[in-house]
């Protein structure tokens, strides 16, 4: 039996949370070795297992993969969440890269100083409701299918629903004008493995709070 993938990252959402969502959708079990201190991180660096001295890192299939998008693409290919041909993969990548822009803002805003944080929350909500969510709603309107590409679940659908949940933490009514995105959220949330992932006690990480912010700052020294 193949070993489970092993994640190395802070015990937080950060850049690993999208990978957690993806493997939940694929129904794949994994293990996590959390980095709790700067010393834990420095040991990984001194052991030479972090190609660019950065985490996340995933041990899988004899590899030590770094760079979140490379990790996502590998698992998407392995578990058939990456389209059937080059054209479908191009669309999946295009949608995923757009979502990555919004996700980057979401990952970083908790570390902003007061004033800046509130401004960035307002900016994220504005971009979600006026740029990103309308674009994806239009995709579903254009083809009338259940999923973004090829009428089959892909990493783009999973990442979109992850971002919907993230943005709903900032505004519970943010999907009010996007019925097709509401339907996608329900569809994916009802998948047994995602339903389990959304329950308390799963490997899904909770929203960032002040304690986790301070811990992350100490680990990464910023």
Curated annotation (Swiss-Prot):
It catalyses: RX + glutathione = an S-substituted glutathione + a halide anion + H(+). It holds the Pfam family GST_N. Keywords: Cytoplasm, Transferase. Glutathione binds at residues 9, 45, 54-55, 67-68. Residues 3-83 form the GST N-terminal domain. One of its GO terms (cellular component) is cytosol. Belongs to the GST superfamily. Alpha family. Homodimer or heterodimer of GSTA1 and GSTA2. PANTHER family: GLUTATHIONE S-TRANSFERASE (PTHR11571), GLUTATHIONE S-TRANSFERASE A1 (PTHR11571:SF107). This is Glutathione S-transferase A6. It comes from Rattus norvegicus. The lineage of its organism: Eukaryota, Metazoa, Chordata, Craniata, Vertebrata. The gene is Gsta6.
């Amino acid at each position: 039996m193949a070993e489970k993938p092993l994640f190395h990252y802070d015990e937080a959402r950060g850049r690993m949370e999208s990978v957690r969502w993806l493997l939940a959708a694929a129904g794949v079990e994994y293990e996590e070795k959390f980095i709790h201190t700067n010393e834990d991180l420095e040991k990984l660096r001194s052991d030479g297992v972090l190609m660019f001295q950065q985490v996340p890192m995933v041990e899988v299939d004899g590899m030590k993969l770094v760079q979140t998008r490379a990790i996502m693409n590998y698992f998407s290919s392995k578990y058939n969440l990456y389209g059937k041909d080059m054209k479908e993969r191009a669309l999946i990548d295009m949608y995923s890269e757009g979502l990555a822009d919004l996700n980057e803002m979401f990952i970083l805003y908790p570390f902003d100083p007061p004033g800046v944080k509130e401004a960035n929350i307002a900016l994220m909500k504005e971009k979600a409701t006026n740029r990103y969510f309308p674009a994806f709603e239009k995709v579903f309107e254009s083809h009338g299918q259940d999923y973004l590409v090829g009428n089959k679940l892909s990493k783009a659908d999973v990442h979109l629903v992850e971002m919907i949940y993230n943005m709903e933490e900032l505004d519970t009514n943010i999907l009010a004008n996007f019925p097709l995105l509401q339907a996608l959220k329900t569809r994916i949330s009802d998948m047994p493995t995602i339903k389990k992932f959304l329950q308390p006690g799963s490997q899904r990480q909770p929203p960032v709070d002040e304690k986790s912010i301070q811990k992350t700052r100490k680990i990464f020294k910023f």
